[in-house]
């Protein structure tokens, strides 16, 4: 399945919520009619079935983290094998992806841009180049910008925007050095309340 390369706003309108796919601090403007389906004359959403609600939630989270369908299913299988709450395990696995950690540290303005930084070998993990976006970051790993990439204007711009956002408590960042430490996996209370991971568990449990 190919990665979606179309308009980012269209995906947010499809899911009826801001997926934070576009750069910037502010949420998507209300004039964008996010409650309406995509299209010039996007209709108001009708009532969804139980399955439809579960599917939409899965699609929302998958698109938010920029993960393909097969990858997402594999993350769920891994989460189900880990002791504890499957839904919370799933979110922690997604949060531990290198592209997401780069985004959380503010080196990329979006997860898509962060994924590109990783793929273009601009990111170091514990001093070594890692160019796999799905690389699993562990507690106390140090993630930094490669020396020759530090002059990139987009990284500087992303860090400036990140300064205005609420900083994740599970990550420590030195913007001057362009490096950060992944202190721990986030707790469920650290993450967005707008995600209902229980619906995803119900969907895959059928």
UniProtKB/Swiss-Prot annotation:
One annotated Gene Ontology cellular component of this protein: small ribosomal subunit
Pfam families recorded: Ribosomal_S4, S4
Disulfide bonds listed in the record: none
Domain S4 RNA-binding: 96-156
NCBIfam families noted in UniProt: PRK05327.1, rpsD_bact
Subunit field text: Part of the 30S ribosomal subunit. Contacts protein S5. The interaction surface between S4 and S5 is involved in control of translational fidelity.
Name assigned to this protein: Small ribosomal subunit protein uS4
Organism: Aliivibrio salmonicida (strain LFI1238) (Vibrio salmonicida (strain LFI1238))
């Amino acid at each position: 399945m190919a990665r979606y390369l179309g308009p980012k706003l269209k995906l947010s309108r499809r899911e009826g919520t801001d997926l934070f796919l576009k750069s910037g601090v502010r949420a998507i403007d209300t004039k964008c009619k996010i409650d309406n389906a995509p299209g010039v004359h996007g209709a108001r959403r009708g009532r969804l079935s139980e399955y439809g609600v579960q599917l939409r939630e899965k699609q929302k989270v998958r698109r938010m983290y920029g993960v393909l369908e097969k990858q997402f299913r594999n993350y769920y299988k891994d989460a189900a094998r880990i002791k504890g709450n499957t839904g919370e395990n799933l979110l922690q696995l997604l949060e531990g992806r290198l592209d997401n950690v780069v985004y959380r540290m503010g080196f990329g303005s979006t997860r898509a841009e962060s994924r590109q930084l990783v793929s273009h070998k601009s990111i170091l993990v514990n001093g070594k180049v890692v160019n796999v976006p799905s690389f699993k970051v562990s507690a106390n790993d140090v993630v930094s910008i490669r020396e020759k990439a530090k002059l990139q204007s987009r990284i500087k711009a992303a860090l400036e925007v990140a300064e205005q956002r609420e900083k994740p408590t599970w990550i420590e960042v030195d913007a001057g050095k362009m490096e950060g430490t992944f202190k721990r996996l986030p707790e469920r209370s650290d993450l967005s309340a707008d995600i209902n991971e229980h619906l995803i568990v119900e969907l895959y449990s059928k």
